[in-house]
């Protein structure tokens, strides 16, 4: 299909404060929230919605409903209406000033179909979310931006930008589900938000070592990087899971299977020498690893970083099951070491993302962004926005649910050098055919 330019007319941005007066308070961030790779970053997402077939929703204005809902939910989440401040010791805290979250309404001159499912890299998509000027003093920036862009067909896109110091991905999805509940007319949230950052007392470096987010640094790029994707459909991923579980006699998750396949395929595509070692880093939700576990509704940062390492020759000559077991063991190791405050090997803390032997994976497929329903049904597609170029790097793979017009399964969004893209897809397809044929 011929690519059509996106034309978006943006209204003036406004600050939306809580719908009820709230006392001004100061809230401390946790030691994880204050890590360098967290406190100075934001993360963005686009949620795409089709026009509703319901006659009652035809005349409904999503921008108006979401703006009103935003004011209501900020009563429950006052930090998102506040601003960051720096303490004398250099830590950040949130002053709940009620200044508000930034809200923007926009209208596109196109139908929603112009967007496809965000698999193509198109800089014009950045028009769907206002980009915060990160060169500005963070004290002057809102901690949340919401932009609603309507299309001529009745569909719309909700673009959101969260300051990472206030929440992680799971916390952001929790907030958006609550925002959607308010937009649908609910008078009470189904999940009460919990701030309580004092529950995460990790001043001990033995704890903080498990939450190193510095791997988000972008490497030096010497070759054209292309955004592309690869889908492992639901039937195939289940075939492969069935095959490997018959061998190992234990449960394997879709993420473990897909990440092992990606690890092997990328290592082959990059032709890394057999004598070297390759490493993958991926996030794990540590909420249940704390003692006691963090309560439901806690939306602060609590994602630990698991590390799986293998020799290239062993990885490529071994089975898919072997790679899966290395990943499974790294998850167990992170959990056990965290609980016992064990000191890990310095090599495991080497997260230099400038090296092609180190790869970072992130799993968005189970966070729940696609379950956010403002009254038009669930999002038909969810995608990050590469405004700050943190994720647009050859060492980063993002696992998502495919768009609704694609087969169910796992969509692997990646940024590869043009010369490696074809080889990677060939290797993935070869593994899929090999394991599906066994069943």
Swiss-Prot record:
EC supergroup of this enzyme: transferase
Keyword RNA-binding assigned: no
Gene Ontology process terms (BP): paclitaxel biosynthetic process
Active site: 164, 373
Matches recorded under Pfam families: Transferase
Catalysis performed (reactions): taxa-4(20),11-dien-5alpha-ol + acetyl-CoA = taxa-4(20),11-dien-5alpha-yl acetate + CoA
InterPro entries membership: CAT-like_dom_sf, Plant_acyltransferase
Keywords: Acyltransferase, Taxol biosynthesis, Transferase
Enzyme Commission identifier(s): 2.3.1.162
Record-linked Gene3D superfamilies: Chloramphenicol acetyltransferase-like domain
Pathway connected to this protein: Alkaloid biosynthesis; taxol biosynthesis; 10-deacetyl-2-debenzoylbaccatin III from taxa-4(20),11-dien-5alpha-ol: step 1/3
GO molecular function, one term: taxadien-5-alpha-ol O-acetyltransferase activity
Acyltransferase keyword on record: yes
UniProt similarity note: Belongs to the plant acyltransferase family.
Protein name: Taxadien-5-alpha-ol O-acetyltransferase
């Amino acid at each position: 299909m011929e690519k059509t330019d996106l034309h978006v007319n943006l209204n003036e941005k406004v600050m939306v404060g809580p719908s009820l007066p709230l006392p001004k308070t100061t809230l401390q961030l946790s030691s994880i929230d204050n890590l360098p790779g967290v406190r100075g970053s934001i993360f963005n997402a686009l949620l795409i919605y089709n026009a509703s077939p319901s006659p009652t929703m035809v005349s409904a204005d999503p921008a108006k409903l979401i703006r009103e809902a935003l004011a209501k939910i900020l009563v429950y989440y006052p930090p998102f209406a506040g601003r960051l401040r720096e303490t004398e010791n250099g830590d950040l805290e949130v002053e709940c000033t009620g200044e508000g979250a930034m809200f923007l309404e926009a209208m596109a001159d196109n139908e929603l179909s112009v967007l496809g499912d965000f698999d193509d890299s198109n800089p014009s998509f950045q028009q769907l979310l206002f980009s915060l000027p990160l060169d500005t003093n963070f004290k002057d920036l809102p901690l949340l931006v919401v932009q609603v862009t309507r299309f001529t067909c009745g569909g719309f896109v909700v673009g959101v930008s969260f300051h990472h110091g206030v929440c992680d991905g799971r916390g952001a999805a929790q907030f958006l589900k609550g925002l959607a509940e308010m937009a649908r007319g609910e008078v009470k949230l189904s999940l009460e938000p919990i701030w309580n950052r004092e529950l995460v007392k990790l001043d001990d470096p033995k704890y903080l070592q498990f939450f190193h987010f510095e791997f988000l640094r972008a490497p030096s790029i010497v070759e054209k990087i292309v955004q592309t994707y690869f889908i492992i459909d639901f039937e195939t991923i289940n075939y492969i899971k069935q095959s490997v579980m018959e061998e190992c006699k234990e449960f394997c998750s879709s993420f473990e299977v897909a990440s092992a396949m990606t690890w092997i395929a990328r290592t082959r595509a990059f032709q890394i020498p057999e004598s070297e070692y390759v490493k993958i880093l991926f996030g794990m939700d540590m909420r249940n690893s704390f003692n006691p576990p963090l309560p439901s509704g806690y939306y602060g940062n609590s994602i630990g970083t698991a590390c799986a390492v293998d020799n290239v020759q062993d990885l490529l000559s071994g089975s898919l099951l072997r790679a899966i077991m290395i990943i499974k063991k790294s998850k167990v190791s992170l959990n056990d070491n965290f609980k016992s405050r064990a000191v890990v090997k310095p090599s495991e803390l080497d997260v230099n993302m400038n090296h092609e032997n180190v790869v970072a994976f992130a799993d968005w497929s189970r966070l729940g962004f696609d379950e956010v329903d403002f009254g038009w049904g669930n999002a038909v597609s969810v995608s990050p926005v590469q405004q700050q170029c943190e994720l647009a790097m050859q060492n980063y793979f993002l696992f998502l649910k495919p768009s609704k017009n694609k087969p169910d399964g796992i969509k692997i969004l990646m940024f590869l050098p043009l010369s490696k893209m074809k080889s990677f897809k060939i290797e993935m397809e070869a593994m899929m055919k090999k394991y599906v044929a066994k069943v």
